[in-house]
Each structure stands twice: as structure tokens, then as C-alpha cells.
Amino acid sequence: MARGDFAFHHSFRVRWSETDAQGVVFNARYLDYADIAITEYWRAVKFRDYADGAPMEFHVKKATVTWFAPIKPDEMIEVMARTIATGRTSMTQLVEIHGLTEDGSDDLRATVDLVSVHVDLDVHRPIPLPDWVKGVFTAFDSQATNMQSSLAEA
């Protein structure tokens, strides 16, 4: 996807402790970066506020990392996230990790596809997503630059 396909963006600097002996970000850290992206994305969406105190707990069912180019220590990166599907008990969210370029050009380093299942923590079994979940993420994601352009053209 293009940067304009995402309403949510968050940037941060890669710490030396996140790199390995090869001088690049250690492979497991890509999932840490996806977790940061999803945490900040949900905060931006105000997801927990909509829950009105109800427990909204999720387990990651599947995480797929697709690597494109290395990330180096002390580099600024930008993570983007959006919801690409909602099911009866789960959400699929896409995270893109880019090098943060001065001109805003695409510098895709990796993508992470996450399937998260809404669970009852007492029994660790899937439970249905509340009806409002899809609408909250759809409304937020529709603020993406490319989404607004598509809506204006329609």
C-alpha cells in the first residue's frame, strides 16, 4: 500500500539494543515494532474509550512478517497501521514499516499482517466482536489521504 492509504502514522528511532551482530534490526524486533504500531493505532482510534469499560482482550492468532530491506541502528522509522478485515471474532490489521524519509517518499522495509482474536480471558476462547468495532476502525481509516481522494471521486 502507499503511505496515503494509512490514516495512522507513528515514528520513532531505532535503538542500538534492537540490532544484532550484523548491524541491522534483529528479526524478532519487527514484531515488537508491529506491537508498538497497533498499540498507538488503537490509542489514536480511541478504541478502549468506545468499550466503555468492557474488557476488550485479544490474542494474536497469526503474525506474518514480510521483509524487504534492512533497518539500521539510530535510524528513524515510521510505522503505519490499518484494519483490513473484521470477522465474527477477529480483526486483521496491516502494519507497514518504512524508513522515515525527508521527502515523504516510500521506503518500505517490512510489512506485518496480524490476525487478532477477541477472547474471554477466563477461558481463553474466542468471543464475538462487539457490533461497534468494525465501524470505529472503518471511520478512522477512512481519514487516510488516498481514501478521501477515492471518496471525493465517487
Named regions from a protein language model:
Residues 25, 58-60, 109:
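A broad, structural micro-motif
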Residues 1-40, 44, 154:
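Catalytic strand-loop segment that frames the active site of acyl-thioester-processing enzymes
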Residues 2, 9, 67-76, 84-154:
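HotDog/MaoC-like acyl-thioester-processing domains
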Residues 45-57:
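Short, solvent-exposed helix-to-loop capping segments enriched in aromatics
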Residues 54-73:
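Small beta-barrel nucleic-acid-binding modules, principally OB-folds
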